[in-house]
């Protein structure tokens, strides 16, 4: 039995960790290196850094953050945000990232997934999907630019395409659930998992440990992402894991 993972997510803007609700209203959380070390020691299975900086200076700061963090971590580090090319991926991996997460650039140029997978191995390539449910069209669509722009690409079509192109993992954020702490989008995540064979990290809505139990009981996703509840110290990684174990679910 593959053990489930709990993964803290740190949105980094201009060298600081920030958090919003439904991708809006960002507030400062703290120093990314300090937080990464804290989560490493607190029992996190992996870490995700998403660089949401708008400037080149911000992206350069991110490389420093990755280098300082990676040398002190004993768990895998995935980095996403602003990645446009194979050179960008090379730079991130050389600075200490274990995996990279592609989003807008992959939607713009799907062949980047294949090129990256061929060059670095599919185990390094995670595709992040910001999924928005459009009630008028009654379908989930992929969004780009940090959730600000909706495309005409349907999520259920896209997940199958990226798997064929060589993605090794999916990071699916349900935008309507992000930061709301009301539970994961179970039905949506279960549908995606039925369409692909690669691991899925679920993001958006984890408000308490029971939400993670429901996630793992009702879907076959591999991991749950947590941000708000951990950053605000409402709970800890170990507390979440303990409740998951009590629910009879194998967790790392």
From Swiss-Prot:
EC number in record: 4.3.2.10
Domain of life of the organism encoding this protein: Bacteria
Subcellular location(s) of the protein: Cytoplasm
A GO molecular function held by the record: imidazoleglycerol-phosphate synthase activity
SUPFAM superfamilies named in the record: Ribulose-phoshate binding barrel
Gene3D superfamilies (alphabetical): Aldolase class I
Active site: 11, 130
Coiled-coil region(s): none
GO biological process, one term: L-histidine biosynthetic process
Subunit structure: Heterodimer of HisH and HisF.
Entry protein name: Imidazole glycerol phosphate synthase subunit HisF
Protein's organism: Staphylococcus aureus (strain JH9)
Species lineage: Bacteria, Bacillati, Bacillota, Bacilli, Bacillales
């Amino acid at each position: 039995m593959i053990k489930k993972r709990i993964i803290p997510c740190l949105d980094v803007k201009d060298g600081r960790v920030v958090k919003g609700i439904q991708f809006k209203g960002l507030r400062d959380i703290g120093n990314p290196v300090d937080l990464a070390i804290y989560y490493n020691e607190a029992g996190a299975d992996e870490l995700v850094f998403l660089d949401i900086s708008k400037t080149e200076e911000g992206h350069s700061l991110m490389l420093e953050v990755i280098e300082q963090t990676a040398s002190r971590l004993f768990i895998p580090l995935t980095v996403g945000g602003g990645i446009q090319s194979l050179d960008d991926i090379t730079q991130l991996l050389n600075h200490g990232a274990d995996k990279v997460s592609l989003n807008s650039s992959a939607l713009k140029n799907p062949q980047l997934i294949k090129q990256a997978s061929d060059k670095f191995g599919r185990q390094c390539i995670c595709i992040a999907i910001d999924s928005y449910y459009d009630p008028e069209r009654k379908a989930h669509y992929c969004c780009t630019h940090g959730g600000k722009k909706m495309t005409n690409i349907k999520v259920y079509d896209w997940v199958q395409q990226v798997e064929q192109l060589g993605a090794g993992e999916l990071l699916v954020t349900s935008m309507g659930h992000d930061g709301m702490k009301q539970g994961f989008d179970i039905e949506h995540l279960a549908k995606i998992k039925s369409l692909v064979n690669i691991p899925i990290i679920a993001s958006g809505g984890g408000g308490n440990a029971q939400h993670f139990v429901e996630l793992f009981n009702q879907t076959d996703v591999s991991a749950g992402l947590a941000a708000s509840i951990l950053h605000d110290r409402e709970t800890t990684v170990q507390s979440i894991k303990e409740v998951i174990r009590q629910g009879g679910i194998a967790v790392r």
